[in-house]
């Protein structure tokens, strides 16, 4: 943050300050349906309707002062404008779709299972290969890092880390456009979009030095940590901030003690709300869960396996589940967009 955190010096063909016009300003702030609640919810994420425009397709479903969780089903690439989020880092998980993340610091090809981390202030466009795209996005007002316990004091990932530097894909194919004209950048600031027209192409960088750049990491490259008995959720941790953590549940061996019960035990997250986004496979602890579903279990009340899930897990050797988890240290508010796709009876699904 500021002059103490990661930074990058970028070298441009032109001054990146040449604003010709500021056009529209409009709000994209999440509209809150339930600010204070204690109900567990299931959201049917694939019920979010596809929309042509990338920004218009982004539907905020859960939010607090630290982060916003967004579902998006864009059908078209961002052709007519560039985008810059000055409020938050963006972690974009690609559930469906392939294409190219084009940024001022180079391009990244993406596919199913990729996390794309775009630091705040990076100007970018999304190019999709087809119209069939599904994204799970976390906007973070706090910087997103790899977990500190995976790194030594030099910043090198240690041998017990479930991924290594080689798994993190840096931008390639630096585009340098030495062009003068009118270039529309949609800038997000304090939950408003400002349409700003610049006199020079925003992708006019000829090179850069530093540590602040976008990168990609595939959930399929996360090496699971397993044990003879049930392991706690931190073994799945992939990213962290000082306000929430992000975990990856991937195919792995179940607990292999002779008397182990693979299903998790009932537990209360007293200090955090738990959000699970179900990507693929059969999630062992849940009944009636499909790809694209989101479960929200608020802090303060217990949750655990659905009836029958514990019994079904006995004797199983492995799981093929794939899911992304976000645990926030502040309570999450439920938005109006979330209520459109919510199962209002989910909290009763543990009744036997």
Predicted segments, located by residue:
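Jelly-roll (double-stranded beta-helix
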Residues: 1-352
């Amino acid at each position: 943050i500021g002059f103490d955190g990661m930074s990058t010096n970028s070298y441009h063909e032109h001054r990146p300050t040449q604003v010709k016009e500021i056009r529209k300003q409009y709000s994209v702030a999440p509209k809150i349906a339930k600010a204070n609640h204690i109900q567990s919810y299931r959201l049917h994420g694939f019920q979010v309707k596809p929309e042509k425009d990338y920004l218009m397709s982004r539907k905020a479903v859960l939010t607090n002062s630290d982060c916003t969780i967004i579902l998006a089903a864009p059908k078209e690439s961002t052709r007519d404008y560039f985008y810059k989020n000055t409020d938050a880092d963006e972690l974009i998980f690609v559930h469906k779709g392939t294409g190219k993340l084009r940024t001022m610091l180079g391009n990244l090809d993406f596919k199913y299972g990729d996390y794309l981390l775009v630091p705040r202030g990076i100007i970018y466009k999304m190019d999709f290969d087809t119209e069939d795209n599904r994204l799970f996005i976390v906007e973070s007002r706090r910087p997103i890092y790899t977990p500190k316990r995976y790194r030594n004091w030099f910043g090198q990932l240690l041998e017990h880390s479930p991924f290594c530097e080689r798994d993190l894909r840096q931008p390639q194919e630096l585009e340098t456009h030495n062009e003068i004209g009118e270039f529309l950048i949609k800038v997000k600031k304090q939950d408003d979009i400002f349409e700003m027209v610049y006199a020079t192409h925003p992708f006019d960088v000829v090179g850069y030095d530093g540590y602040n750049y976008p990168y990609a990491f595939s959930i399929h490259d996360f090496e699971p940590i397993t044990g003879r008995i049930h392991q706690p959720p931190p073994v799945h941790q992939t990213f962290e901030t000082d306000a929430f953590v992000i975990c990856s549940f991937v195919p792995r061996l179940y607990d292999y003690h002779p008397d182990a019960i693979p299903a998790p035990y009932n537990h209360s997250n007293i200090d955090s709300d738990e959000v699970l986004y179900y990507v693929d496979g059969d999630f062992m602890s849940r009944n009636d869960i499909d790809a694209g579903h989101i479960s929200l279990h608020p802090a303060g009340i217990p949750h655990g396996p659905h009836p029958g899930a514990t019994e079904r897990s006995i004797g199983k050797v492995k799981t093929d589940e794939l899911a992304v988890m976000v645990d926030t240290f502040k309570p999450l508010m439920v938005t109006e967009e979330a209520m459109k796709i919510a199962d209002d009876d989910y909290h009763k699904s543990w009744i036997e």
